[in-house]
Amino acid sequence: MIKSIKGFNDILQVETATSRPSSEWRQLEAMLKQALDQFGYEEIRLPIVEETQLFARAIGDATDIVEKEMFSFTDKSDPPTPITLRPEGTAGAVRAVIEHNLLRGDSPKLWYMGPMFRYEQPQKGRYRQFHQLGVEAFGSEHVDVEAELIAMTYLMWQRLGIDHELSLEINSLGELDERKAYRSALVEFLQTKKEQLDEDSQRRLTTNPLRILDSKDPNTQALLMEAPRLADFLGEDSQAHFEQLKTYLTALGIEYVVNPNLVRGLDYYNKTVFEWVTDKLGSQATVCAGGRYDGLIGQLKSIGKSEDKAKAVKSEPAVGFAMGLERLLLLVQAVNPIQAQPACDVFVVVHPDLYQQGLLYAQSLRQARSDLRVKMASASSLKAQMKKADKSGAQLTVILAQDEVESGTISVKTMHTGEQVSQDKLWLHSAENFRL
């Protein structure tokens, strides 16, 4: 038997060992989209695959994603082009903004939702194909956009009833030159204690030393207590920017914790970074994360240009976040479960010999009532159809037998009470007679 590939899961109409029912996904997505609409953000739909160099340049060659987690291959062109299933959405969104000149005279605020792909060890809430909501705001260097995005996520948590189970952690990475100075000081400090670092941190010391700050190894974390602090290397502008963000968050009533070791796993961030974390899923888990990436647009614009022309490329400010929907749905179901929705409101049961009349009735009802979901079973026995009606979750079952067709009536059964009455054939066509 052919099965789905490890880490690539079906999302069905029923719960499985690896996924919640599709009806819960739809409700979750609808609630998130409502908040996005309220803030005036617009949807974009991006390709699943991009050129590999886009992610290598944007995310960083030394990151875990590029080094170990990307699904990459070549296409059939001549010469072949290296392409990659997208491991995240920001790089593709920035590519689209550049390619279509969306920044010309505008400051677009965009969102996208869909599958991402990373070659990781599958575990609960973390799969090789997973789903993200990504939100990006372009063209503003002001801290108010960062506060707006955090306020948006906070509103989403409130609507989902999980705001008390999430904690906001924030930090400032400063500008590139400030981060480089800190990087040098951190490496110099850790080189003297290299043998005490865990194996992964020893490797990162030469490839991506800032990621050592995010190590989960307790001995490494103990060493970092004595290490230089990034905050001590921030210039006045970066410090003022961060203080303004904290002022805005306080005014919004959003509690936060400054985490000096929060650096994020992608190279393109500068200044503000943030994460929403929870311990409700076992060990502390990140549900949503983001930050500012003012240099990424210029970096991607310069691809293929000479060194002199690349230096002349103007970058644009940008900030965004992404949230993993599998993990978010797990949290929602643990704290404030989404109520399962039935597949239909009205189930039409019809004598097998009268199936054409049943089809016509169901279709006329759908045309008259766009608010109703009307379902029919195949032309099996009445008994078999009634069993399906019982399982459907419908509020009403409409029964069409020979007597009803001849008299122009229908039998309407209220499913939760079992009461069954005869009504005019067009009774359900009027919202005055039956409302959801």
Swiss-Prot record:
Localization: Cytoplasm
InterPro entries (alphabetical): aa-tRNA-synth_II, aa-tRNA-synth_II/BPL/LPL, Anticodon-bd, Anticodon-bd_dom_sf, His-tRNA-ligase, HisRS-like_core, HisRS/HisZ
Gene Ontology biological-process annotations: histidyl-tRNA aminoacylation
EC identifiers of the protein: 6.1.1.21
Molecular functions (GO terms): ATP binding; histidine-tRNA ligase activity
UniProt entry tagged with the keyword Acetylation: no
Catalytic activity line of the entry: tRNA(His) + L-histidine + ATP = L-histidyl-tRNA(His) + AMP + diphosphate + H(+)
Key words, A-Z: Aminoacyl-tRNA synthetase, ATP-binding, Cytoplasm, Ligase, Nucleotide-binding, Protein biosynthesis
Broad class of the protein's primary localization: cytoplasm
Entry GO terms, CC: cytoplasm
Highest taxon listed in the record's lineage: Bacteria
Signal peptide residues on this chain, from the entry's feature table: none
Subunit architecture: Homodimer.
Annotated family: Belongs to the class-II aminoacyl-tRNA synthetase family.
Protein name: Histidine--tRNA ligase
Organism: Psychrobacter sp. (strain PRwf-1)
Lineage: Bacteria, Pseudomonadati, Pseudomonadota, Gammaproteobacteria, Moraxellales
Designated gene of the protein: hisS
